[in-house]
């Protein structure tokens, strides 16, 4: 024998089912909010990395980007990052690049403070080839603080742009400040640009 459900009971049952559905939807919505990466927030404040600056159209420099800089990096519409440290890229930063289609080019240069350390000229040269390839732009160049390794790469780029050494050194010292190294400036002075002169003026 099948019991009939009265209209009142049916109405109460529907209300309970609707309540459970709304509760599940609310829980899913809350879960979705917490799963969103912080850089996706449209209301996020744009905070540039330490020592950030525009070098040229489509070329930028900075210190190491932290998570609170990611929204700012998105605003640059980067295609590539040139990373000048030998240490592995942090997992959080790697995930950010992967999820936003940004390619990482790593040229590990030792950040030793020893005055007699040799700066690897070939790595600087290869980094410049990547930076000046318009297919990789917009591109961000960075090391740890955006001072020495980044400063050397940008200084060598300026030589390609025919800057005089005084201007090259002034820019380097602006970012390095009290930490400026004579060895860095000597390296930039002696850097041979002849093998890179085939790069077009528009790339520089």
From Swiss-Prot:
Domain of life according to the entry: Eukaryota
Record-linked InterPro entries: PFA-DSPs, Prot-tyrosine_phosphatase-like, Siw14-like, Tyr_Pase_AS, TYR_PHOSPHATASE_DUAL_dom
Q: Catalytic site residues?
A: 143
Specify which residues bind 1D-myo-inositol hexakisphosphate according to the UniProt entry for this protein. 118-119, 123
Annotated region Disordered: the residues are: 1-27
Instruction: Give the reaction(s) catalysed.
Output: 5-diphospho-1D-myo-inositol 1,2,3,4,6-pentakisphosphate + H2O = 1D-myo-inositol hexakisphosphate + phosphate + H(+); 1,5-bis(diphospho)-1D-myo-inositol 2,3,4,6-tetrakisphosphate + H2O = 1-diphospho-1D-myo-inositol 2,3,4,5,6-pentakisphosphate + phosphate + 2 H(+); 3,5-bis(diphospho)-1D-myo-inositol 1,2,4,6-tetrakisphosphate + H2O = 3-diphospho-1D-myo-inositol 1,2,4,5,6-pentakisphosphate + phosphate + 2 H(+); 6-diphospho-1D-myo-inositol pentakisphosphate + H2O = 1D-myo-inositol hexakisphosphate + phosphate + H(+)
Q: Which UniProt keywords apply?
A: Cytoplasm, Hydrolase, Nucleus, Plant defense
Q: Does the keyword Transcription apply?
A: no
**Where is this chain compositionally biased, Basic and acidic residues type?**
13-27
According to UniProt, where does the site described as Transition state stabilizer lie?
A: 149
Q: Name one GO cellular component term.
A: cytoplasm
The record's EC number reads 3.6.1.52
Which GO terms are recorded in the biological process aspect for this UniProt protein? Answer: defense response; regulation of defense response to fungus
Q: Write out the ranges of the annotated region (WPD loop important for active site topology).
A: 107-119
Enzyme class per UniProt? hydrolase
The compartments listed are:
Cytoplasm; Nucleus
Can you name one GO molecular function term for this protein? Answer: inositol-5-diphosphate-1,2,3,4,6-pentakisphosphate diphosphatase activity
**Tissues and organs where the protein is expressed, per its UniProt entry:** Expressed in roots and young panicles.
Q: Where is the Tyrosine-protein phosphatase domain?
A: 51-203
Provide the family line. Belongs to the protein-tyrosine phosphatase family. Atypical dual-specificity phosphatase Siw14-like subfamily.
* PANTHER family attached to this UniProt entry: TYROSINE-PROTEIN PHOSPHATASE, TYROSINE-PROTEIN PHOSPHATASE DSP2-RELATED
Misc. comment: Plants overexpressing DSP2 exhibit increased sensitivity to infection by the fungal pathogen Magnaporthe oryzae.
> What does this protein do, in the record's words?
Cleaves the beta-phosphate at the 5-position of soluble inositol pyrophosphates. Has highest activity on 5-diphosphoinositol 1,2,3,4,6-pentakisphosphate (5-InsP(7)). Acts as a negative regulator of defense responses against the fungal pathogen Magnaporthe oryzae.
The protein's name is Inositol diphosphatase DSP2
* UniProt source species: Oryza sativa subsp. japonica (Rice)
């Amino acid at each position: 024998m099948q019991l009939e459900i009265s209209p009142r009971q049916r109405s109460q049952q529907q209300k309970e089912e609707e309540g459970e559905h709304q509760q599940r939807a609310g829980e899913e919505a809350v879960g979705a909010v917490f799963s969103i990466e912080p850089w996706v927030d449209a209301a996020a404040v744009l905070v540039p990395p330490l020592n950030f600056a525009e070098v040229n159209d489509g070329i930028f420099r900075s210190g190491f980007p932290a998570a609170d800089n990611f929204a700012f990096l998105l605003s640059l519409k980067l295609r590539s990052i040139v990373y000048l440290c030998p240490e592995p890229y942090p997992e959080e930063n790697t995930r950010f690049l992967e999820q936003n289609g940004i390619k990482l080019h790593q040229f590990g240069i030792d950040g030793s403070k020893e005055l007699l350390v040799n700066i690897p000229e070939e790595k600087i040269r290869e980094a410049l080839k990547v930076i000046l390839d318009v297919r990789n732009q917009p591109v961000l160049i960075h090391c740890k603080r955006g001072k020495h390794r980044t400063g050397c790469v940008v200084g060598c780029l300026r030589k390609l742009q025919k800057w005089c050494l005084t201007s090259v050194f002034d820019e380097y010292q602006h970012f390095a400040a009290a930490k400026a190294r004579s060895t860095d400036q000597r390296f930039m002075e002696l850097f041979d640009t002849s093998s890179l002169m085939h790069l077009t003026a528009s790339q520089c």
